[in-house]
Structures are given as structure tokens and as C-alpha cells.
Amino acid sequence: MSHNSQAFLSTNAGLPPSYETIKEEYGVTELGEPSNSAVVRTTVINMPREVSVPDHVVWSLFNTLFFNACCLGFVAYAYSVKSRDRKMVGDVVGAQAYASTAKCLNISSLIFSILMVIICIIIFSTTSVVVFQSFAQRTPHSGF
């Protein structure tokens, strides 16, 4: 029999060969501590992660196109673009300052616009009720 067939034809049918048999067969030796152990040194470098500054350009553009109360949306858009420019240059503090101003202007524009929409709805609904009542009183009802 060849060396390859001995692994398949063992006396322990159905049982895996023992560790000693494999160790002797393949010449595995147990390794201990390395004879000349070198000191392992580690170096930790703290890399500052890139600070993400939201510039609110999309929100400002939305307010400019749809809720431009007192031109606050347009001014917020200008500050958002300035914030993005400062971020591209690398001035994080300036970008945060412009972004904060743009955020405040966007909030103000949104609040003013929502209030204007609510006031317009109230005026339209009360006016339509008054007009409907005045037409109902003036027109006589026919018996048909």
C-alpha cells in the first residue's frame, strides 16, 4: 500500500485518526516560545476626523423657491453658499458661523411662511363664509 492509502484504510473504521498518529505521520513538532523574542512596540497616531459642517444649502434653496418671506430664504441661501465656500477652503470655524446664521434664517423664514399660510387660510375661510351668507340672504328661495 502506498502512503496515501494508509490514511483512508485505518483499523479504526469510522473514527478519525488520533492526534498522535497524525503528528507522527506528518512529522509535526510542538513549538514553544521563540528563542529570541523581540519586543513588540506599538505606535498610536490620533488622527483628527474630518469635521462635518452642515451648510443647509438644500433647505435654503427650498425656502428661497417656496417660502421666501421677507427675502429671508434668499439671504439664508447666500449664507449657506458662504458656509460651503469656507468649508472648501478649510476654515471650519467660519463655515460653522455661516451655517449657524443660515440655519437661523431658514427657521425664521419657515415660521413666517407657515404663519402667512395660516393667516391666508383663515382670511379666505371667513371671507367665503360671509360672502355665502350674504348671497343666501339676498336671493329669495323659489318654491320649486
UniProtKB/Swiss-Prot annotation:
GO CC entries: late endosome membrane; lysosomal membrane; plasma membrane; protein-containing complex
Keyword tags: Acetylation, Antiviral defense, Cell membrane, Endosome, Immunity, Innate immunity, Lipoprotein, Lysosome, Membrane, Palmitate, Phosphoprotein, Transmembrane, Transmembrane helix
Ranges in the topological domain labelled Cytoplasmic: 1-56, 78-110
Major place of residence: membrane
Subcellular location as annotated: Cell membrane; Lysosome membrane; Late endosome membrane
Intramembrane segments: 57-77
Keyword Secreted appears in the UniProt entry: no
Tissues in which the protein is found: Predominantly expressed in nascent primordial germ cells, as well as in gonadal germ cells.
InterPro entries: CD225/Dispanin_fam, IFITM_antiviral_protein
Pfam families reported in the protein's UniProt record: CD225
Posttranslational mods: Palmitoylation on membrane-proximal cysteines controls clustering in membrane compartments and antiviral activity. Phosphorylation at Tyr-19 is required for endosomal and lysosomal location.
Extracellular compartment residues: 132-144
Membrane topology reported for the UniProt record: Single-pass type II membrane protein
Residues with the Phosphotyrosine modification: 19
Entry's Gene Ontology BP terms: cellular response to interferon-beta; defense response to virus; host-mediated suppression of symbiont invasion; response to virus
Lipidation (S-palmitoyl cysteine): 70-71, 104
Modified residues (N-acetylmethionine): 1
Membrane-spanning intervals of the chain: 111-131
Family per record: Belongs to the CD225/Dispanin family.
Function: IFN-induced antiviral protein which inhibits the entry of viruses to the host cell cytoplasm, permitting endocytosis, but preventing subsequent viral fusion and release of viral contents into the cytosol. Active against multiple viruses, including influenza A virus, SARS coronavirus (SARS-CoV), Marburg virus (MARV) and Ebola virus (EBOV), Dengue virus (DNV) and West Nile virus (WNV). Can inhibit: influenza virus hemagglutinin protein-mediated viral entry, MARV and EBOV GP1,2-mediated viral entry and SARS-CoV S protein-mediated viral entry.
Subunit and interaction comment: Interacts with CD81.
Record PANTHER family: INTERFERON INDUCIBLE TRANSMEMBRANE PROTEIN, INTERFERON-INDUCED TRANSMEMBRANE PROTEIN 2
Protein name: Interferon-induced transmembrane protein 2
